[in-house]
Amino acid sequence: MRLKIFFIVCLSFLSLVCSASDVVWYNGKSPVNYSVCEQHDKVVDVALDLFSSDMQAVTGRYANKKSNSVIEIYQLDRLSNKEFGQLSKYSIPINKFITQPDAFYLANTGRKVVVVGSNGRGTAYGILELSRLAGVSPWIWWGDVRPTSKEYLIMKDGYKSLQIPSVRYRGLSIGGEDWTLRPWSKTLDHRLPAGAIGPRTYKKLFELMLRLRANLLWPADDLGTTPFNRVKGNLEVADSCAIIVGSKDPLLRDDKVEWGSRNGEYNNADNHRWLQHYWEEGLKTAGTGEKMFTVGLGNFAILGARNEHDKRQLLQKTVHEQLKLIKKTEDKLNKKNKNAPADYPTLIIANDEVRSLLGNGLQLPDATTVLWPDDGYGYLLPAQGHLSANRKGAEGVLVHLSYQGTPHDCLWLSTPQPGLLVSQLDAALARKANRVWIAEIHEPKVAAYALSLFFDKAWNTSSVTSDHLERHLTSWLSAQFGQTLGQRLLPVMREYYRLTAIRKPEFMGWNQLTSDKDNPKVNDTEFSTDDFGNELERYLSDFRALKNRVDELSQEVPAPLHAAFFAAVAFPVKAAEAMARKQLCAQESREISRPGTFHHDEEALEAAAASLDAYDDLCSLSRQYDALGGGKWAGLMNMSPRNLSVFASPSLPDNLSQKERRQYGVGMELNSQLDAENATAATAAQYDHFSGMITTVPLLGHSQRAVRMAAGSSVDYNFHLSGSGDALLYLAFVPVRPQSNGSMRVSVCFDGGKPIDIDLACPQGTDEWKKAVLRGQLLKKIPLAVDGYRSNHTLRLTAIDDGVMFDQWMIDFVDDRTFYMIPTK
């Protein structure tokens, strides 16, 4: 009787919220049902399994396949004539997307919820779009984001959504997995030998990629990792999930592991026969699924050539031979495969040597995509102007969300500023690099928002712009934690991105790596304890306030989302804060202490105890991460990737006794008062006038409001100076690279004087580039003479070239001041 009353109440409620033409696809009584066309790809079944599980999480009951269901699912390229006839009764604009790979249409039509995909992937994306509409986050498994239960699910009258991907190939690259993904994978593939990442791990990764609408994988390929194709089941699970398999190295090989000294030189001139055999054998083991082939000579130097002309000829010959080898091998493998791909997409990575040759007449087939990489830290390298202007073939970009290399690894947290990611992808679009986009990460969980942002942008390039970036972040946070908490978390994440832009946690050791085997000691930071009111403690104070705010908001998180909140918000904020506290308090202790007096100096002991407490906090946070979900993520978050010195226990004047730890470990008092006497500073966005095309980019730069400037645009500032005489003008820029003609220049004019031109090109590998990458700013310094008879002053900065990202400026009358942060509020 009670159950009957409940259903009557539910039906009464539905009648109030639904119009006659709305479609109720879950009514609170029966499980969600669907029908699907008879012939469809395996990936559709994978998506339906995910959808069924999603519905169980939302409604308490798994979705079922059933004829004459309210949800109808069609895969256009596998339909029978009868099924086409059934579909024709609905008003669906099939001609707009039938030839578009991976596209789908979802609509309330004919009192049905109809999902139509152009191919298997498109159909799968359409099915999982229903999960999104039901409130299921793509991070339901990887992020432990449990959806809110629903009493009913309705598709409103008139709802229709046609989605066609902007970028054809949307890829994920795994790199730096030695310390994270690979050891964690043993929790899923525990029977596999050391070094192998197996099909259970990749299945979970591919399911995430389906939810994010990524379709291309460059598998994990670090030196200790077994090549993807050698692990039984990996190719099969990729095929079942319709994931295109590619590789960083040529022709689906893993050169770091598979090319040994026994093979001789990686030299296609003098060792041609063996290289051809090596590549052909690799192709034979690559299976019959979809593939994308990297061509060229990878990261090896082009050997066997005496000069640039010979290098160019040899590389052109190599690519030509590789394309013939690909066609020969693939045609043979797919001879009996009626679903064989119609073409074999290829790309070449424009590393330094290839870029140089592209600028000197290297000819590549138009069918081969040129993939422009970033510098490892999110700043796209310049394209070759001749290639971009004259080549008909497609282009793409590779963006790192984490990185192993010089000047320092980023393999712990993933802290790319959203504004940088979007602005660089917009730069790629401006130069028509929109065929292939690949994001590299050491493991996906730590980069949940960055990956969501990247693949949302790749799916629909106009859906995420600088103007709406904070709205996108708020929407993502709300999708994970609910609208109220999501809105409250926006300022938290804004501040997190600001503080980690000032210095990434991995860079807090203030040292540089010169090779993979290098591990230099930790140095003192450039944060001053004397100037601008102790900027070291001010930075720590800001981090402390942020951590406290996270603790406050954690009390509002529903119990089912505790694990999700910890991993996505609490852990990164608290870990970054603890790293800063560990290093900066240790530095204060070293600076305060004098030889022989350390154990009698309360200030030095307090700072040392605070540093040790921070290290203990890092250990505790890592243990909490390992314990999430009953050990589900054990091994994924390593607190000391590659055992670099920045992650070690703090370097202090001497050891503290347990008694000293208890006595002085009560927390330091922090001086957070800003004192900018004799200096005037502002953010770039605080201009009084502007001309030309400029855009303020949120979540970018130390200011979090960097100004993107087109060639010929200018910004003007009017201000008062209290001093006169000699001064220094500091100009801070986001260290993006030239994108058009290889140059990036600005001119600056103070008080209407003669303009001074400044070169911002900052070539990769130079000391200036290394410092700029580590600082997150390119800092330029210009001497000024300030007229004491003027009370009001002006500053004009003009972009000579496109792409300038202006961040902050300061005029300082103290010529020997030591500081790290420009003191803007």
Where are these predicted regions, by residue range?
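Structured mid-domain segments that build the active-site/substrate or prosthetic-cofactor binding neighborhood
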Residues: 210, 215-218, 225, 372-378, ...
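An acidic-aromatic substrate-binding cleft motif
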Residues: 139-194, 200-220, 393-396
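Extracytoplasmic
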Residues: 646-825
